A protein has these predicted regions:
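Iron-sulfur-associated redox domains of electron-transfer enzymes in respiratory
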Residues: 87, 92-377
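Iron-sulfur cluster-binding cysteine motifs and their immediate structural context
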Residues: 2-24, 35-72, 77, 81-97, ...
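Nuclease-adjacent, charged terminal/linker segments that flank catalytic cores
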Residues: 26-28
Length: 377
């Protein structure tokens, strides 16, 4: 009787007990390729993948003959899923927390030169023990000169992206560096369709550096790939460091700051539409609103994709002449930025918290939000 698993194994790692006819796998020969498991029609062989391998949607992680994990940089899109899923802490994102502490000290707590913190809108759903205003106060106590919403950068981006979409007729978003990297590495024919706009983080960082040349800028958010983004030639001059929400919490803890007992600081730069960038669908809503506010006669037909599997399907459809959409909103994480690998919480109500945060915006339109740019000091 033929055994499919034995034939599937190219390493001759599978043999059979002549008495019981049960399969025996020689671990000295097995390389955990999983071909035997796929070939067995009885599911007698189970292939338990490492959490990091299972989490990686672009198949960038493999193991060598010594069972050490390897990351293929030619495939990796810096989504951070492996970091989040590894239960052993074996994979870590590079931290700039020491560099930020040194920069704050060197600036004499923003007295010699101002250090701006740009906070991602997903922060509104993260710190359950304190209000957002109290968290903003905590950030200032760490030594930052000012705290600004990345959502304001989102307002700026959506305004320009709406114009670009109407001119080109088809566009993919550029806000998520993981999505942009995914296109460049897997769908080169679509690279020309990526929006030319910088991300909200970089757009706002650029503005801050232009009005305050000696300023330093630190982005704080849920994202690992932002740490790679700031190395890009188009971005490196605008954002100095990236911290995750986890690293922000570590800094707050290191100073024994009890945010829940602090007075609230105001954070009211952005519009509702800029703030909802934090969840899937928010970017598309903002582009629609921007077209409306600028009186541009163009109907946006968005395809909203969250998570790399959905992004893959969307990009495959984009190459079809029968596509029925003209804009792809791509986010590397499920549910958008609120599903980021360095979020402090991944709860169903996070989307509700972001929408609530959006509804509290003082600036009701994108145009109003852009109009407050001059007030950033």
């Amino acid at each position: 009787i033929a055994h499919r698993c034995e034939k599937a194994c190219h390493r001759a790692a599978i043999s059979f007990n002549p008495n019981t006819r049960t399969a025996i796998i020689d671990k000295t020969k097995c390389v955990n390729c999983g071909l035997c498991s796929k070939a067995c029609q009885y599911n007698a062989i189970q292939n338990f993948l490492r959490p990091c391998v299972q989490a990686c949607k672009v198949k960038a992680i493999s193991t060598d003959e010594d069972f050490a994990a390897k990351i293929d940089d030619n495939k990796c899109v810096q989504c951070g899923a492996c970091v989040y899923q590894c239960p052993f802490g074996a994979i870590m994102d590079k931290s700039s927390i020491v560099d930020v502490i040194k920069m704050i000290k060197d600036s004499d707590f923003s007295k010699k030169y101002p250090i701006y913190a740009i906070v991602a809108p997903s922060i509104s759903s993260q710190f359950k023990y304190a209000t957002l205003g109290q968290v903003v106060t905590s950030i200032k106590l760490l030594g930052f000169h000012s705290v600004v919403e990345a959502a304001l950068g989102a307002d700026m981006v959506s305004y320009e992206e709406a114009k670009e979409l109407s001119e080109k007729g088809f566009l993919t978003s550029s806000c998520c560096p993981t999505f942009v990297s995914f296109i460049k590495k897997n769908y080169p024919k679509l690279v020309e369709n990526i929006s030319s706009n910088l991300s909200p983080m970089a757009t706002l960082g650029k503005y801050i550096k232009e009005i305050t040349p000696n300023a330093k800028v630190v982005f704080i958010g849920p994202c690992v790939s932002k740490k790679q983004e700031i190395k890009d030639e188009r971005v490196k001059d605008y954002v100095d460091y990236v911290l995750t929400f986890e690293e922000l919490q570590a800094l707050i803890d290191s100073r024994d700051i009890d945010a829940s007992k602090l007075e609230e600081s105001v954070l009211d730069n952005a519009s509702y539409f800029g703030r909802i960038f934090a969840r899937t669908g928010g970017l598309s809503d903002a582009v629609k609103q921007s077209l409306k506010e600028q009186n541009i006669d163009f109907e946006v037909k968005p395809l909203v994709c969250d998570g790399l599997d959905n992004c893959k399907m969307g990009l495959i459809k984009a190459q079809s002449p029968a596509r029925d959409f003209n804009f792809i909103e791509g986010m590397g994480c499920i549910n958008g930025c609120i599903g980021g690998p360095c979020c402090l919480t991944h709860e169903l109500r996070d989307k509700t918290e972001v929408d609530k945060y959006g509804n509290l915006a003082k600036e009701k339109t994108i145009s109003d939000a852009i109009g407050v740019l001059k007030d950033i000091k």
